[in-house]
Amino acid sequence: PQFTRIPANYQMANAEHYVRERSPNGFTMRTELQLALEYDGKFAGALSFHTLDLDSGKAEIGYWLTADIRGKGVATTATRLLTEYGFESIGFHRIEALVVASNVPSLKVLKNAGYMQEGIKRDACCQDDGTREDMVLFAAIRTDWGR
């Protein structure tokens, strides 16, 4: 699986370009499904299924939130709901997530949303400054979901 490298300084112009150029093509080509998150009537971030493999029933989930929304449980709730949608409406069997090991809030999101940690991909992420970090692999399996 891959993960979305959204820079910390992500600006509205970046988001607008992404929505105009990449997101519609991914949906049309059946390679990704992008959703905007709204909280209290304001844009709060994005959630997606990417690296879709509809034939084998797999996808990777990703999310990011605006800074003012973090820590309110929005990502956990949205991740749980999109996962349920993936299992019940799309028919996925397995949904994966990769998180940089130092991203403790994101690790908590996945654990609280019901994902199981499956392993560590050592030195799998290269930061902008050239340092390498481990990635943590999580997954949700349809037959285990909701237990």
Language-model-detected regions and their locations in the chain:
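Acyl-donor (CoA/ACP) binding surface of acyl/acetyltransferases
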Residues: 34-147
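Short, conserved alpha-helical segments within structured domains
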Residues: 7-11, 33, 102
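A short helix-loop-beta-strand connector motif used in the catalytic cores of GNAT acetyltransferases and
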Residues: 20-36
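Conserved GNAT-fold acetyl-CoA-binding loop/helix
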Residues: 1-21
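Alpha-helix C-capping/helix-to-loop hinge sites
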Residues: 3-6, 22-25, 68, 124
